[in-house]
Every structure is written in C-alpha cells, then in structure tokens.
Amino acid sequence: MMRFSKIIFLAFLFAISCLTVPLFAETAPVSARKDNRIRFVNYDPYNVTQIIGSIRSSVQLEFADDEEVTYVGIGNSVAWQVAPAGHFVFLKPREVQPVTNLQIVTSRQDGTKRSYQFELQVREGDVSAGNDTYFLVKFRYPEDEALRKKLAKAAEAAQREENFVNDVFNIHENFGPRNWAYEAQGSSLIEPASVYDNGKTTTFTFLGNTEIPAIYLVSLDGQESLVPKSIKGNKVIVHAIAAQFTLRRGNDVLCIFNKRFVPEGINPETGTTSPSVQRRVNIGNGHEG
C-alpha cells in the first residue's frame, strides 16, 4: 500500500513539473524550394528566430519594405560582425564561439516599431547548397498581407459601386427627362445643333468638325463666367444649368436662353438628377452620401 501511494505521489510531482516548467524552442526558418540557404519565417514578436552562419560567408536578414533598422544589439560582437542597411541587416560570423543572441528594432513609416529576437550559431564547413547554413532570411507578415488584401477588396468594391452609379447617371443623361426649351439670338456661325439640360447639366451639340466656341454662364445680374465642362465627341456638357449662356468665338457672339429655367433643377425625389440613385444622409457622422 505504501509503495502504491509513493508511485501516485511521484506521478503527481511529475505532472506538476510539466505544468510549471515552460518549454523554450527557437523558430527555424523554412527553406526555399530551390535552395535551402534561402529561408523564410513569419514575423512573431515573441518568437526567437534561429540563425546559422558559417565561417567565410555572410547572412542577410530582410524585413518589410516599410521598415528601417533603428537599433541593433548583439551578445557577442567578437564572434559576429553586424551591418544594418535600411530594412536589411548583414551578419558575418568571425569565429566559432558558443551560441549568442541578436536583438533588432525597426521603425515603420506609420511610426510604429517592430522587435526581433534571434539566436545566433556559428558553424564551420562547406557552405554549398544542402548544408545547414543560411545566406538569406526573409521575414513574412501574414497579418499585413491579409490587411492589404482586405483593403484592395474594399477598394475594388467601392470602384464597382462608383462605376455603377456613373453608369446610371449616364443612362439618365442620355435617356432621362430633358428640357429642350432653348432659344438662340446672335451669330448662326457658332449656333449649336441642339441644346438641352437634365436639371443638372446642360448639353450643347455641334455638327461635324465645327470649332467649339467658348461657353459662358450668364448670372442673373448679367455677369459672364466660365464653368466646368466635359467634351464627349461633338457634345459639350456644361456642369451647370442657367437662364442664359453666351457663346463666343472671335467676333461671333450667340446668346442661348433657357425658356423653362428652374433654379433647383429637375427633382426626381431622390436628391439627385437620377431617379435610380438616391442621396443618403448619414446623421451619425454629420456627412452626406
């Protein structure tokens, strides 16, 4: 009975020792497919990365492109030579000595920092492929890559939505409600073939290779001003509506009058010039979308 109790007690002590004694192990970088001297490792600030250098060869550490090495600390500067350069660090073992450590801190463009821990080992012998030696250790950043993909996906979705909205506006520009009630007075040499508006923009159409005149918006007090416009083929789309426009080319002058001018434009009850695109007000952040 006493012997059985002793066995149970020893087993209990062993179990407790397994729970209370932590296990330490460095991370060995993964070999590249074509050459085992090229290595890759995922960044983890709480991992120690193993580096094996060989006499008469150097090891290159490569961090993210947006990082710059700002601090390097090494346990044995006699056995190892360290040379930081931008987001790289070059290591050269000088002599075979016991294992030591290397600590590197980098600064990123967004102001944050990253910390790296290394265990350095030196070996002698052949440095050709197939031997246990490192030439390049490149860090990978899965979280950064996942974030880049997420942002790229969101940007693509936003672009698709913008393209869809533009397509809808173009449809209603071409096929939506129009005001054709315009009259012209002045030189027929610069008279457009047609003029209409959709409540937001005014479109002037010219024939053939006609030299397009300057188009001025005339305010209610008679002042003329140039306004933004787009040219699509033989059409000039002025990004405004007005009671009067004045066209000028050299000595030729033509006045265009909007006989059905409505200052607020066409209202399709959506807050835009398209009945298919609605304007949304976000109360929470005080912005309109």
From Swiss-Prot:
Region (Disordered) residue spans: 267-289
CC terms in the record's Gene Ontology section: periplasmic space
Cell compartment(s), UniProt: Periplasm
UniProt superkingdom: Bacteria
Pfam families associated with the record: CagX
Alphabetical list of InterPro entries matching this protein: Conjugal_tfr_TrbG/VirB9/CagX, VirB9, VirB9/CagX/TrbG_C, VirB9/CagX/TrbG_C_sf
Purpose of the protein: Component of the type IV secretion system VirB/VirD4 which could be a major virulence determinant for subversion of human endothelial cell (HEC) function.
Protein name (Swiss-Prot/TrEMBL): Type IV secretion system protein virB9
Signal peptide: 1-25
CDD domains reported for this sequence: VirB9_CagX_TrbG
Subunit organization: Interacts with virB8, virB10, virB11 and the 15 kDa protein that is encoded within the VirB locus.
Biased composition (Polar residues): 269-279
Keyword vocabulary terms for this entry: Periplasm, Signal, Transport, Virulence
Family listed: Belongs to the TrbG/VirB9 family.
Any coiled-coil regions, as ranges: none
